[in-house]
């Protein structure tokens, strides 16, 4: 059997524009922040904030810029979490999710109507897109590592 990979596209998918998008699960004091969208076809859905990656930047740079623009905070400790692909409004969206931290909590709202601080045990109390639910599951898998200090093994 050949050692190769082939992705088959449906007619609908092959004509779609592709977007690279990033989002960040901000973890502070044992809770993760989710945000409710306030416009467009995603109005009312919750997500991890982020946005489109510009051609001149890395995904991590895009995430830091988007958090500053949308929430007016500086994030750090940006760590890769998971990828997801979604199809919305004629776009094939390649979503990369990171975890991050900050020394401050956001107060500015621009593309969101509210911020909620929750834990993975209660995160499904809020409405997420199917593609974002895969990211939530990835977050649940690493949650103990994000919220408990590491103890050295002797």
Label the model's feature ranges.
Residues 126-129:
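C-terminal structural segments of small proteins and small subunits
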Residues 28-69:
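Conserved Nudix-box catalytic region and its N-terminal flanking loop in Nudix hydrolases
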Residues 84-106, 116, 120, 132, ...:
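Active-site-adjacent beta-strand/loop module that shapes the phosphate/pyrophosphate-binding cleft
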Residues 131-154:
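Charged phosphate-binding loop/patch that engages nucleotide di/tri-phosphates or the phosphate backbone
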Residues 13-32, 83:
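Conserved N-terminal beta-strand and adjoining loop/helix that marks the start
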Residues 73-83:
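A short coil-to-beta-strand element that immediately follows conserved catalytic motifs
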Residues 3-15:
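Short, Lys/Arg-enriched N-terminal segments with co-localized hydrophobic residues
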